[in-house]
Amino acid sequence: MKAEAVESGEASTIIAAPKRGINRGISIADLILRGVAAIGTFASALTMGTTSETLTIFTQPIMIRAKYNDLPSLTFFVIANSIVCGYLVLSIPLSISHFIRREARITRIILVIFDTAMVELLTAGASAATVVVYLAHKRNANWLAICQQFNNFCERISGSLIGSFASIIMIMLIIITSAVALSRH
């Protein structure tokens, strides 16, 4: 009986059901990834932005302070993470609309363009901060290693880099899921 239905040209509803389920799954994955990436960028910006440590030298009454805004690369890192976090929070309603309306092709294209720009900005900020963190842990000809003295400062800035690089991976996955959703239309 099924062979006759296929031969006579009748369409089967079994084939359409998995496509709808896959599109819904892609929309859910997009929404979850945006939320996780927003939390990661927020935590990275907050951790780096509140990083400060003061060291007192006992031989002289001198206090040395290490703070993120002493270095322009770390300031750029905080600004980049804040911008990307704001973008991700503002893009969540569009992601929810893709969950409700699966045919929203134009907004998906716009989100892919902005997602790509945001992953570039976040990568630039994380890369700039990575150089400073590396030089803080290891020394260079012109830099002294400061992590032996400012242990808490170095732990916090290293941790915020981990959150930022994890968010970069999440945004790349968002771009991939959006491209898959666009190719399915």
Swiss-Prot record:
Gene Ontology terms: biological process: cell wall modification; cell-cell junction assembly
InterPro entries according to UniProt: CASP/CASPL (IPR006459), CASP_dom (IPR006702), CASPL (IPR044173)
Sequence similarity: Belongs to the Casparian strip membrane proteins (CASP) family.
Protein location: Cell membrane
Entry keyword set: Cell membrane, Cell wall biogenesis/degradation, Membrane, Transmembrane, Transmembrane helix
Taxonomy, superkingdom: Eukaryota
Name of the protein described by the UniProt record: Casparian strip membrane protein 5
First-listed, main subcellular location of the protein, grouped into a coarse class: membrane
Function: Regulates membrane-cell wall junctions and localized cell wall deposition. Required for establishment of the Casparian strip membrane domain (CSD) and the subsequent formation of Casparian strips, a cell wall modification of the root endodermis that determines an apoplastic barrier between the intraorganismal apoplasm and the extraorganismal apoplasm and prevents lateral diffusion.
CC terms in the record's Gene Ontology section: plasma membrane
Membrane spanning residue stretches: 26-46, 76-96, 109-129, 161-181
